[in-house]
Amino acid sequence: MRQCMDADNLHRRLKKIIGQVQAIDRMVDEDVPCEDVLSQINAAKSALNKCGQVVLEGHIQHCVRDGIQHGDADKTIESFTKAVERFSNMG
């Protein structure tokens, strides 16, 4: 699986998200206004969604392409459909 995505890019994004979530946790302790906390939650959610896009793009560029060219196209399409369904349920 690692070869089908830009692992360095993904790790960098995930570390940023971890920092955002830790900041949100501190905001709760510091009694920051709810609107500001919600804004930061939305930012972290958007960043996590972008991580999903990175994984899905890698899946398309590598796994799907390879599966269609060298494997079973029907199985590849089924796998791709499942990946898209899982990603679309992240919202």
Which residues are covered by each model-predicted region?
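Solvent-exposed interaction patches of small proteins and small membrane subunits
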Residues: 1-91
